[in-house]
Amino acid sequence: MNSIARRSAVSVAGLLVAGGVLAGAGTAAQAAPTESTLTVAPPPAPPAEDKRVLEHDYQRQPNGYYCAPAATRIALTTQGEAPSQKEVARKLGTTVDGTDSVDQTTRVLNEVTGGGYETTKISEETAKPEQVDKLRADVIEAVDAKRGVVANTIGTGVDTTGEPHPFPGGHYVSVVGYRDGGEEMKVADPYDPEQHYWMSDDKLGDWIAQRGYSS
């Protein structure tokens, strides 16, 4: 190959190489802005669990007949009131035979907090659907207003794990929260060793049946 042809070949090769580099750079330069300006929407966050539990001070009842004073006190602590169980028992008129009815817990809750509580009775042996609906609505309203609920129960209540809580002579518990739109309720039990458990609204309604609750 003569020198002129060799120089021409080198020049053409140089242009091809340069063109390839430039073309590559141009492709990268065009791709880079696309990558940097591409906005990818994050995956939607999973819905937050519909749950609300009030802050409260749990105390276990000291004997077999102080369930109402203990449950009432737990409810009072959701509103920043923390009297002793003995003081609450005196206000309730509690004796070794227990506390007469939920009317007393409603009265004392209103006396200490300034009002807002009402008594609801379920006189039947099992709660009717409309009574369960009212219980759910009352618990949601009370908890949203930062008021613990006191429930007077009798018989055996079964929590969401299937654990039975038998009180054939009657018992008092506090309801301090709800989840799943109120279909399950957080019970603070002043007698139970576990202290707290969840119970469905219909199971709690049946447990309250023949008694009542303060909300």
PLM feature spans:
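Active-site-adjacent structural segments surrounding the nucleophilic cysteine of cysteine proteases
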Residues: 2-111, 157, 163-164, 181
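Conserved active-site-adjacent core of cysteine acyl-enzyme catalytic domains
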Residues: 32, 87, 91-215
